[in-house]
Amino acid sequence: MTVLDSILDGVRADVAAREAVLDFAAVKAAAAAAPPALDAAAALLEPGIGVIAEVKRASPSKGALADITDPAELAAAYQAGGARVISVLTEERRFQGSLADLDAVRRAVSIPILRKDFIVGPYQIHEARAHGADVVLLIVAALEQDALASLIDRTESLGMTALVEVHTEEEANRALEAGAKVIGVNARNLKTLEVDKNTFGEIAPGLPTEIIKIAESGVRGTADLLAYAGAGADAVLVGEGLVTSGDPRKAVADLVNAGAHPSCPKPSR
């Protein structure tokens, strides 16, 4: 069993437990009653290389990363530093996240929020919207093709943006076939947890110009952002490098300033 398979087993059990308490009809009603989703795609296409800053307590590869007692305060610091989008981990077992974190961050910031989790079905899509998410992560390696296409459609039908994550060219092709408009290339292989920063540069050039391209994993500082920008990234998603920085607002601001500098490569579109 791969690391991804193990995570998905836990997620399915946790979703079933939540659905036993709050059924699908109730979650759909809560999603319908939520304020309209913010336009994350537009935010990511603003001038300069965007920064998606992540609230991340732990990871399967590193274990505990940061003692985040106040996710709202951290998210507010990210926004003050110039982040375009805030990513919030909601997976409980390996990442120590929660929907309560999503709620807290939603109350604290006025920019789009990404629910970062392992989505396995429509319940979680409506759940994300009900808790204020504007973007949902869909991982190609975790989904059959029909389910991927269906979940992209459902996400967009609720006014949200689907960030479709890939790690190989085959997965990128699947994402395009399913209708993805925003594609994240993860340098980390979720089946082995190994990181290869060259992955983005191998996959992104083959994506259509109109696709919004996000580089995920491996950003430790401005040099990494500039390298990803040179390979065609519209934005970078950064978690560990921010929560371990000691000054998250400054760490975000440094990345944002590098991405806005005239010498930074600009995406062609």
UniProtKB/Swiss-Prot annotation:
It catalyses: 1-(2-carboxyphenylamino)-1-deoxy-D-ribulose 5-phosphate + H(+) = (1S,2R)-1-C-(indol-3-yl)glycerol 3-phosphate + CO2 + H2O. It comes from the Bacteria. Keywords: Amino-acid biosynthesis, Aromatic amino acid biosynthesis, Decarboxylase, Lyase, Tryptophan biosynthesis. The keyword Transferase does not apply. GO terms for biological process: L-tryptophan biosynthetic process. Pathway: Amino-acid biosynthesis; L-tryptophan biosynthesis; L-tryptophan from chorismate: step 4/5. HAMAP family: IGPS_A, IGPS_B. Belongs to the TrpC family. This is Indole-3-glycerol phosphate synthase. The gene is trpC.
